[in-house]
Design a protein with these regions (language model features):
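A domain-start/cap signature at the N-terminus of enzymes
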Residues: 21-62, 132, 161-176, 318-325
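Primarily recognizes the serine-hydrolase "nucleophile elbow" in alpha/beta-hydrolase
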Residues: 147-201
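Cap/lid segment of the alpha/beta-hydrolase catalytic domain
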Residues: 80, 103-135
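Alpha/beta-hydrolase-fold serine-hydrolase catalytic core, especially in secreted/extracellular enzymes
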Residues: 228-229, 238-325
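Short beta-strand element of the alpha/beta-hydrolase
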Residues: 59-71, 78
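Short amphipathic alpha-helix adjacent to the substrate-entry channel of hydrolases
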Residues: 77-104
Length: 325
């Protein structure tokens, strides 16, 4: 009986300590969280609210952007504080903290048909969607400039991630403001805007599931982006539907770390002035070629083993994470 009481007391003390630690962490995040809203000039999406979470050190060495599935600013705030009942981003926030990155987050608002790609829209539909989201991208950029001017946010070299509808938003934003981004990971996006040449300046990680309803649309984006010489790491996970898993997250973070290392290398070669990696050169010299349909990797010299439609150059640092089943 005494042992049971002692164990219960220890368990209670541990629970209280963990709760206190979580509350302290939440309080620390809350005290650093900065909110800024920008008018979009759209009637059905009048205002974009951005949240900035500086690193504990105060001076960020980079930026991780989170495009979130959140209907309003309160939900974005709850997700960042870890109090949301819908979504948790502790792994992304931990990734940022470990690398001394600031976090910029917002709620994704849909202005397009989530069940269609650019190549399934009429010209009039595409024109309207483009015009509307151009205004959103302008508002987003105005918010970034505010954070840069008033809170020391770096001007470029950003990482960005999003899933589902938030990935659709992230992909469209990256195509409109590629100069801000170093690498983007979009998962189960299911709806894509048309790739453009200026989008080849950043590293794309595009993941989905073979059982996901938008699987074919994701493959079409991969082929179109690759044919514009965009550096792209594409992976469709067998058996996966409209969901994520640890391997998806690991591949995305591996792409981010790879991009950060190449960014640091390019910056060093540029005398310390921030410089983007030469992705075209990096990918053209990759030693491996992947078959994205049959989930196989070959030496680059055996590229003829892979049909052109499924062929993807794969840098060596990403091979292990891409091959994980």
């Amino acid at each position: 009986m005494i042992r049971f009481a002692a164990r219960a007391a220890i368990a209670l003390s541990l629970s209280l300590a963990l709760a206190a630690h979580a509350a302290g962490a939440e309080g620390g995040v809350s005290s650093r969280l900065i909110e800024y809203s920008v008018k979009t000039k759209l009637k059905n999406y009048e205002q974009l609210t951005l949240f900035l979470l500086p690193p504990e050190s105060g001076k960020a060495e980079g930026v991780l952007c989170l495009s979130l599935l959140a209907k309003d600013p309160d939900e974005v705030r709850a997700q960042l504080l870890g109090t949301s009942e819908r979504h948790s981003h502790h792994r992304a926030l931990a990734f940022a903290a470990e690398r001394n990155l600031a976090v910029v987050a917002w709620g994704a608002h849909r202005l397009w048909d989530p069940s269609r790609n650019w190549d399934e829209l009429s010209r009039a539909e595409a024109k309207k969607i483009d015009a509307d989201f151009d205004l959103v991208a302008n508002a987003w950029d105005a918010g970034i400039k505010y954070f840069a001017k008033n809170h020391g946010l770096p001007a470029g070299g950003y990482l960005m991630m999003g899933s589902s509808g938030a990935a659709q938003y992230a992909q469209r934003l990256a195509l409109r403001r590629p100069e801000r981004f170093l690498a983007v990971h979009v998962h189960i996006a299911s709806s894509f805007d048309v790739p453009v040449k200026k989008g080849a300046s950043l590293l794309w990680c595009v993941t989905t599931g073979e059982n996901e309803l938008g699987y074919e649309r994701t493959r079409r984006f991969f082929r179109a982006a690759r044919d514009l010489y965009s550096p792209i790491v594409y992976k469709a996970y067998p058996g996966l539907g409209h969901e994520g898993n640890a391997k998806v997250t690991a591949l995305g973070f591996a792409c981010f770390d790879y991009a950060l290392s190449e960014y640091a290398r390019a910056t060093k070669l540029n005398g310390g002035k921030p410089a983007m990696p030469d992705w075209a050169d990096i990918f053209s010299s990759a030693p491996s070629v992947a078959d994205v349909f049959n989930q196989a990797v070959y030496s680059k010299f055996d590229y003829l083993c892979v049909p052109v439609e499924f062929r993807m150059l794969l840098p060596e640092p990403l091979r292990a994470k891409w091959s994980a089943e």
